């Protein structure tokens, strides 16, 4: 029954997304008749002329929401009446994505929110944020029951992943706000695989991991428990949403292909809806596993309900990110590139 429901939902979403492309392209055709020079606005007998979009996504929660889009809107699978044709790549390191954006081999990418701000500062406005796609996904995991609060981490060793990105700054901020100097905690930065190895081999180990790495660890070792949700700890402080993942684009690409970017965002929002639907977990998990966004489909199925997918654009996106960036800036200006991003950083927020 669940499999049937997932297939029906996938079919419904496909029809919805195809209809969205048709609607977008009708507008584009009118703009073309008025003299628009955008490649995505040119109509032909076979359908609209497509604009190729080089899209990169981080493995893990930041990339999960795009799985449907990546699968069904590639250069090979994009419908004839849709102006978007994705060439997608999934990578594990923020640096791979930022390097690709800087050198122009990626046009649009899903990255950590603090990385987006740093990159905008580094490129002097060469990057804009298009949407927030992921909220809080960080957890403190433990073998044992000694950690009941952030304060309990004082004097402990914590294996963690995410140095130089949101996880490091969020952890340090939450420790400080709970009366613990981060220097009182032995935070050992590692890859997710190394953290998992330490947790499996240790008797009373503690770690910080994001979903789905946290999910995979708990599936591998039944003795590991979820001690704290850092989203819950953040919410206790009343500092707005813990906005951890976003979609960014190269400013040059955005200015040259505005209709394509808007069509991409329409499709991305629909993809988020599909990937976060609780009745379609099996189908969504299959896509995530197939594309290598998680290690396998089984982990994806367990992790999806905790991936905290969202889709926030325009003025709401700006308000959400500015509140989050203000917290990071006060804690460590270098975490977002030394200054608050300019208004032009926020696409469609005017």
Kindly label every feature range from the protein language model:
Residues 254-331:
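Secondary-structure end/capping motifs
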């Amino acid at each position: 029954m669940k499999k049937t429901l997932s297939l029906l939902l996938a079919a419904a979403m496909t029809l919805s997304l195809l209809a969205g492309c048709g609607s977008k392209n009708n507008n584009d055709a009118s703009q073309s008749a008025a003299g628009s020079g955008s490649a995505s606005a040119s109509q032909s007998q076979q359908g609209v002329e497509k604009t190729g979009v080089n899209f990169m996504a981080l493995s893990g929660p930041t990339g999960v929401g795009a799985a449907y889009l990546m699968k069904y809107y590639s250069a090979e699978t994009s419908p004839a009446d849709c102006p978007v044709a994705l060439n997608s790549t999934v990578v594990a390191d923020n640096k791979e994505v930022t390097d690709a954006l800087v050198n122009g081999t990626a046009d649009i990418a899903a990255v950590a929110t603090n990385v987006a701000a740093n990159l905008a500062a580094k490129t002097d406005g060469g990057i804009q944020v298009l949407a927030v796609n992921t909220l809080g996904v960080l957890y403190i995991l433990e073998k044992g029951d000694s950690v009941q609060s952030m304060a309990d981490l004082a004097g402990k060793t914590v294996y963690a992943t995410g140095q130089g990105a949101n996880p490091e700054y969020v952890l340090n901020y939450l420790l400080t706000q709970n009366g613990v100097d981060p220097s009182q905690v032995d935070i050992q930065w590692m890859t997710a695989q190394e953290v998992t190895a330490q947790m499996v081999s240790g008797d009373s180990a503690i770690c910080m991991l994001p979903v789905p790495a946290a999910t995979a660890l708990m599936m591998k070792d039944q003795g590991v428990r979820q001690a704290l949700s850092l989203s819950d700890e953040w919410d206790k402080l009343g500092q707005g949403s813990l906005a951890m993942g976003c979609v960014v684009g190269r400013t040059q690409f955005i200015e040259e292909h505005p209709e394509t970017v808007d069509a991409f965002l329409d499709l991305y929002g629909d993809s988020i809806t599909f990937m976060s639907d609780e009745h379609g977990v099996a189908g969504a998990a299959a896509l995530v596993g197939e594309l290598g966004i998680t290690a396998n489909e089984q982990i994806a199925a367990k992790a999806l309900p905790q991936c905290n997918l969202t889709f926030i654009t325009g003025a709401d996106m700006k308000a959400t990110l500015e509140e989050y960036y203000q917290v990071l800036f006060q804690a460590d200006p270098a975490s977002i590139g030394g200054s608050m991003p300019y208004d032009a950083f926020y696409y469609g927020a005017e």
